[in-house]
Amino acid sequence: LQACRTAEADGFDAILITCFGDPMLDQVRAFVNIPVMSIGEAALHYATMMGKKFGIVHVSEKNIHECVKTVHEYGFGEYLAGVVATTESAEEQAEALLDAHGAIKAFQACGRKLIDMGAEVLIPACGLMTSALRAAPKCEDEYPNGLTEVDGVPVLDVLSVGLKFAEMAVDLKKAGSPWVSRKGF
């Protein structure tokens, strides 16, 4: 939390939490007076604007329950088609930042399961997974813009969405609009 307060004192305009689980989101928002956004919350909001149902590809089966709980706490339960975990190990996921072939294939397989469950938008539930899918290292010829869809269903770039939500909150704050309610804090 102190690092967030220091960032605010140093003149940063916003804070972006780049872990999909949105750790400490409410605590950071209560602690500073600059916009605090997270890739998880922003992605869920944006996905509901893109389609009626979204599916989430998670990095670990161990986190699926917590992910579903968070989706419901944010009020998006009715939009959730499902959550599936990639079959890649943590090591393979890290290697995807250098060679995304395995990550793309694993994501496509998960995405197809979610599409069968009704997903109209696919959400990678990790900033690092998103980086690998978007940059698509060693896959640039086949995916010049990264993995942007699976069988016609869009893959959300959670990092870009989070960044754009943060930029929007900064712009609105500079225009005089409050960026967060302090009532619940």
Roles of regions detected by a PLM:
Residues 29-50, 137-163:
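Short, acidic/small-residue loops that bind anionic groups at enzyme active sites
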Residues 6, 27, 46-49, 66-70, ...:
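Alpha-helical scaffold segments in soluble metabolic enzymes
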Residues 1-46, 50, 56:
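Glycine/small-residue-rich loop that forms an oxyanion/phosphate-binding "nest" at active or ligand-binding sites
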Residues 22-26, 43-44, 64-65, 130-133, ...:
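Short, well-ordered alpha-helical microsegments
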Residues 19, 126-127, 159:
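Short secondary-structure boundary segments
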Residues 49-86, 102, 165-185:
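Short, glycine-/small-residue-rich phosphate/pyrophosphate-handling segment
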Residues 12, 32-33, 51-53, 79-81, ...:
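Short coil/turn connectors at secondary-structure junctions
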Residues 70-134:
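Active-site rim beta-loop-alpha module in soluble metabolic enzymes
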